Each structure stands twice: as C-alpha cells, then as structure tokens.
A protein has these predicted regions:
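Positively charged n-region of N-terminal signal peptides that target proteins for export
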Residues: 1-4, 18
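Sec-dependent N-terminal signal peptides
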Residues: 4-13
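Bacterial Sec-dependent N-terminal signal peptides
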Residues: 15-35
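Extended, charge-enriched "interface" segments that sit outside catalytic cores
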Residues: 53-151, 158-164
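Aromatic-lined, polymer-binding surfaces characteristic
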Residues: 143-358, 364-365, 541
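CBM-like, beta-strand-rich accessory domains located in the C-terminal region of large
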Residues: 267, 480-710
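Carbohydrate-active enzyme catalytic cores, enriched for enzymes
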Residues: 314-473, 520, 648-654, 671-710
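Catalytic Cys-His active-site segments of thiol-dependent hydrolases/isopeptidases
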Residues: 474-478
C-alpha cells in the first residue's frame, strides 16, 4: 500500500512540474500548454472521441469541448486528465526507473541514429543474443524510413523471426531508457516507429489470418504498449495527438484480438490474448468497451486458470519456460486488478491455483538458479536474474511462504526448503536432491502423462537431467528451432534423451505414471512407467543412495521379440557455456556386459556413468558425438553412448546404471552392479512386483530393492 501511495504522490507532483522540467521537441505538432480559446492542431485523430465514454468521471471538460466541436482543446484537456487519473499499472516503476546495459543497447539501436536496428527474439546480425553488446538487424530503408518487410538473408524461412518482428520487442527497453535518461531520441524513435508500423499494418476489421494481427503478435504489442505509456505520459514531448493515437491503437488492438481468438482453448497464446483484453479493461476504463473487455476477459482468465495448469500445478504444455510465462501473466493480471480495486471480481481460488504453480518453479530449478532444456525451455533464457525476478514476484504474492522467501532472497531471509524427494505425479515431474545450495546434487526425472501430444512437449518419457555442484552433467537436448522440419524432429526425437528405446525409434505414447515414491533406510526410490510402444513398456526405477549417487534400473518388457533395445546417455558440454564436451569426456569402453564413461574436468567435479545389462543377446555398444541446444539456432557438441541388447520372446531387457559423482583420480574409483532377483538361468525375467539388486561403489556394497502393492 505504501508503494501505491507513493505512486499517487509522485503523479500529483509530476503534474505540477511536467511542463517546466523538460525542453524537448514534441512528437506531434502542438504546444502542450492549454489555451483558453481554440488551439490549432494538425493530425489529430478525432476518432478517439467516439471510443471514449465522455460521461466517465473526470471527463466533463473533455465532453464540453467535444459538444462545442472544439476537438483541439478537448484533446489537450484529455491529456491533462490522463496525467492525473487514478489508474495504476503495477508493471511499471515510475518512481525509481532503471535500465540495464543490455536494455540500453536495445533502445539505442531502435532509433534513426541507430539505423532502426530492432530486437527480434534472439536473432542478431553480430554478437550473441543477450550479451548486451549484440548488433540487431537493420530495418532502415534507402530513404531513411523503416522498411517493415525486411527479412535478412538466411531468415526467409525462420518462422519465429517472421512472426516475432511484429511484436515490437524493443518498446519497453526504449521507454525505460527514456525514463532514466530523459533523452528525446527515445520517445521520438518510439512514436515514429509506432506510427510507421500502424500505417504499414492498419488494424483489420473483422477476421484475418495476417501474421501481424494473429496469435501472439497483437497481444504482445498491446501488453507492451500499455507498459510504455506511463513512462511517456508526463513528457513534454508527448502531445495530445500522441495520446489520441495510442488510445485508438489500444481500442483497435483489443477489438482485433477479440475478433481473432487463437484456435486452441488452453494454450499459452490464448492466455496472453486474454491477459491483454482484461488488462486493457482495467487500465483504460474510460473507453466505451472497457466494461465488456473486463467482463469477457476476467471470465476467460478464470477458465484459463483451470485449463492452463494440471491438478498438481504444472503447466499443461509441460515446458518450464511456458510455465514461467503463464504464472507471470496470471500474477500480472491479479496485481493490476488489485491495485485498481478490481480483485474481488476475480475467482476466489485465484491465488491458491497460482500458489501450486509457483511451487513447481521453486522445486524444478537447479540450486544455482538455472534450468534444464526440457522440451522448448531454452535454458539460456532462464538466467539467474530472470528466475530471481520471478521468484521475488512469487514471494510478494505469497508472503507466508517462508521457503519461497528463502529462494527469492538467495537465503538471506526465510526458511531453507527441506524436501529432498518431490513428486508431481499428475504431470510427471520428479526431483531427487540432497540439498538446496549450489554445491548440492539434484536429479530431475521427466515422465509426462500427455495423451494430447502437446506441441511444446517432446517424446522423452523417462529422461533425466543431472546437476552436481554447479554443473549440468546430462543437459536435455533442447529444441534448437521452432521451424517445422528435420532439425526440430531430430532434437525432439526420443533417442536424443537419456532413455531406453526400441530400435532407436521415438515413443508412440506419452502415458507416464508414478508407481512408487518413498524414502527408506539409506536411500530414496522413485519408480515410473510408460507404455512407450504398442508391444513394449519401459519401467524406470531411480535410487538415490546415501545422498551421494544415483542408481537407475531400466526394465523393458512386453511382447516384442528379436528387437534391439537401446540404453541411451547423452553427456555433458564443456566448462564454458557453448564449449564442446568432447575434450572433457573419456569413453572407458565396453567390456563383457558393461559400458563406462567418465568426465575429466579439472575442478574436482566429475562423474562416472557405468551401465550393466543383465542379458547379453547380441550385446554391443556405440559412442560418438552429437549436440544439445540451450537456445534457438545454437548448439553445443557433446558425446553420447548407447548400450544395445536384443530382447528375446518372453524375456525382458534389464539395465543397471550407476551415476557416481566423484573428485580426485578416476583410477581410484570402482563401480560394480548386478541383479539379485534372478539366477543366470532366469536372467531376463521381469518381476512386476519389484526388483532387487546389489551395487558396490569403491568397495562398499549396497543392497537396493522396492516392492509395489499389486
């Protein structure tokens, strides 16, 4: 409350000094100071008065001028009103604005002086995206204007570039740059580009399939437009014409989104569209259809709250980045409604639904505030600063959650979480860890129940990601591209993951289910299963032994016969983010029924992965190099191994894999493992009720087992 009271005080003070503080050129053709008589004005979009509810409290003077036909002074009065109105956008910090070096780089390039170089997703002409020094592609035409049809060579078929260039992603960084520096070039560039864009792509009437007015494009533009207006509204460069054009743009964007809803009713796209509609209804109550927008949008948001998340709180597309985005959208809607006195009109269970969703992020991120590349996550975007920003929002939303506060403050306040085994059985995410600090060990197991085969989800049921003391040892493949084609299919294929496959084929089904999750003396155990193929089911049991190492037991059982079963491990990258892992990997080789590989980092943070097969029919091993992707159009080389065994009729193929973190010399490490629930004569027998085995690490034997309640 103190924050919003301070905002009110600031706004009142700003109104009193806004005409004297700056000496700028206007981004229109009118001196802002109101005159008692008629004001000459060119380029005024008088249609703004047809979309305003002139009976709205505070617009009396505007209405009087309109009734007298004096639209020039009506527009000046409207601007004065807008600068003092009691409507607040909590997404904007006007009291203490800040801009990062990276944002300033974006803002500077998106100007005439910067050759109209616009940020479009991760696409750059030079430099690495997100580095803060990258150079974006220029949209400058020969006459110095903006050429919105620009498509750089090589990006003609890049679907994400062709769509995201219509989201105008530089607007918010540019507004923040203006708020901090008060340099005229930023507001001038923003307004010039905005008018140019809307002239090139006027709002359609009714339905359209044009990319610039479909899907996320208009919703993202509108959400950002609503977030830049508070930064500019008190500038002497912001004219009545500018306000009129912005209000008409808001109206046209909302109406176009309403006329062109995205076809899939529970996707992240429809949520962003509804967020734009309901937010416009809150932030622009003076517009004639604001009531409709809020009513329609809030009802849709209530439905989306239930549709977007599964019962256990995980986003229905099973992707960490889209989960993060959906939670952020819902929190933004809630806070905007809250600060403007509309929160009572949202569903009563709104915050509790979000509490579960926020809890998933708390549990799925690695202890160094990073994520894996599961599905389309693109871990390069999930930086520590991004994750902390979202965790702080969660902590503010749920101040009673002491564990969230601990994470959000990097341990400065709150209570360190104690959970070591966490399950999300409806969706199929599981975490096994020995702590919550950077030097901890953590494994994520992914076995989704996804009968709809969501587009952002990959057929990787059973895969694992492994983090040890700041290093990802088994980074997920990632997606590499959003384009339909062989590259996307390659990275999404099952064999690109740490799983068991049949003849290297991708899974036919994603029907993961949890069979067991329990703590027992000396270890934790997690057992899941997926009927991956019509004739083969894959069961995976993961033991976390002595909070030290993992043992993975894979059993492939079913009717298929005389078919190779593959145990795939996709290994680590190098020490640097985009460095090959080949120079840090030793394939120790295949011997008898086992395959061993280990890492060779020079910081005493290494791992051994040794796999054993119970049966040896046509047994063999392969290894080579491949890639994983942390970001669109980037890939990192790594090694992989594959242990192959033929499955015989009436038998199962069973593997034991030991994942042993170690420091010191590799030569001093020893790992052995064997099943103890079969004899040599009964090898390959599947026991549906459970499994028993013995693992010996560095001379210390450990008996492991689980039993299911049949």
């Amino acid at each position: 409350m103190k924050k919003y009271l301070a905002i009110i005080i600031f706004l009142i003070a700003a109104v009193g000094c806004s005409k004297d503080v700056l000496a700028e050129q206007p981004v229109g053709d009118i001196n802002l100071k109101p005159a008692p008589g008629s004001v000459e004005m060119t380029d005024l979009n008088e249609s703004v008065f047809s979309i305003l509810n002139l009976d709205y409290p505070g617009l009396g003077e505007v209405k009087s001028f309109c009734e007298a036909g004096d639209y020039a002074n009506a527009s000046v009065s409207l601007l004065d009103y807008w600068r003092t109105r009691a409507v607040y956008n909590p997404e904007v910090d006007i009291l203490s604005p800040s801009v990062s070096a990276g944002e300033l780089n974006i803002a500077d390039q998106a100007t005439e002086e910067g050759e109209w170089r616009f940020k479009v997703a991760v696409y750059t002409e030079e430099g690495e995206s997100g580095s803060g020094t990258e150079k974006f592609w220029s949209f400058k035409a020969e006459d110095g204007s903006i050429n919105w049809s620009t498509v750089p060579s090589g990006l003609e078929n890049e679907k994400e570039f062709l769509s995201q260039k219509h989201r105008l992603q530089w607007m918010v960084p540019q507004a923040k740059a203006y708020a901090v520096t008060k340099e005229f070039k930023y507001i001038n560039a923003w307004y010039t580009a905005w008018i140019s864009y809307n002239t090139a792509f006027p709002a359609p009437t009714g339905q359209t399939d044009a990319v610039e007015w479909s899907g996320l494009q208009p919703a993202c533009r509108l959400n950002d437009l609503m977030n830049v207006l508070p930064y500019y509204i008190h500038s002497e460069s912001f004219t009545p014409q500018a306000l009129a054009n912005v209000l008409v743009s808001v109206y046209n964007h909302v109406e176009s989104i309403r006329a062109n809803p995205f076809g899939i009713g529970d996707s992240n796209i429809i949520l962003t569209q509804q967020q734009a509609i309901v937010t416009a209804g809150i932030l622009f109550p003076e517009l004639t259809k604001a009531g409709e927008w809020f009513s329609e949008g809030s009802a849709a948001v209530a439905k989306q709250l239930n549709d977007q998340f599964n019962e256990d709180g995980v986003h229905n597309e099973f992707d960490i980045s889209y989960h993060l985005g959906a939670v952020a959208d819902f929190i933004s809607i809630y806070k905007t409604a809250q600060v403007n006195g509309r929160v009572a009109e949202l569903p009563a269970d709104y915050t509790e639904c979000l509490r579960k969703a926020a809890g998933f992020i708390k549990n799925v991120i690695y202890p160094n505030y990073s994520t894996d590349n599961f599905n389309d996550t693109r871990s390069a975007r999930m930086t520590k600063s991004v994750l902390l920003k979202n965790l702080r929002k969660y902590s503010e939303m749920f101040p009673d959650d002491a564990e969230m506060k601990w994470l959000a403050t990097e341990g400065a306040y709150g209570t360190k979480p104690a959970a070591t085994l966490v399950s999300y059985p409806v969706s199929g995410y599981y975490m096994m860890r020995n702590g919550w600090t950077q030097n901890s060990t953590m494994l994520i197991h992914k076995n989704n129940y996804d009968t709809a085969n969501k587009w952002h989800n990959q057929s990787d049921n059973g895969t694992v990601g492994l983090y040890v003391n700041g290093r990802r040892f088994l980074p997920d493949a990632g997606c590499y591209t959003y384009n339909d084609g062989s590259d996307r299919r390659t990275y999404a294929s099952t064999e690109m993951h740490n799983v068991v496959t049949k003849a290297r084929k991708s899974y036919e089904k994603r029907e993961g289910r949890l069979l067991l999750a329990e703590n027992t003396t000396g270890y934790e155990v997690l057992v899941t299963e997926n009927p991956a193929y019509s004739d083969l089911t894959i069961r995976r049991a993961i033991f976390f032994v002595d909070n030290s190492y993992y043992v993975i037991v894979d059993e492939a059982y079913g009717d298929c016969a005389d078919t190779p079963i593959n145990l795939n491990f996709k290994l680590w990258g190098g020490k640097a983010d985009n460095e090959s892992g080949k120079g840090y990997t030793v394939i120790d080789g295949f011997s008898d029924n086992s395959l061993c590989v280990h890492s060779t980092f020079d910081d005493d943070n290494n791992i051994i992965i040794k796999s054993f097969s119970e049966t040896t029919d046509n047994i063999g091993a392969e290894n080579s190099t491949g890639y994983f992707s942390n970001e669109i159009d980037t890939k990192v080389q790594r090694c992989w191994t594959r242990l192959n065994v033929d499955k015989k009729s009436g038998k199962a193929v069973r593997f034991i894999s030991v994942l042993l973190p170690f420091s010191g010399d590799f030569s001093s490490q020893s790992v052995e493992a064997e099943f103890t629930d079969n004899t040599p004569e009964t090898a390959g027998t599947f026991h549906p009720e459970g499994v028993s085995l013995k693992v010996t690490v560095n001379g210390t034997p450990q008996t492991l087992s689980y039993r299911l309640n049949q």
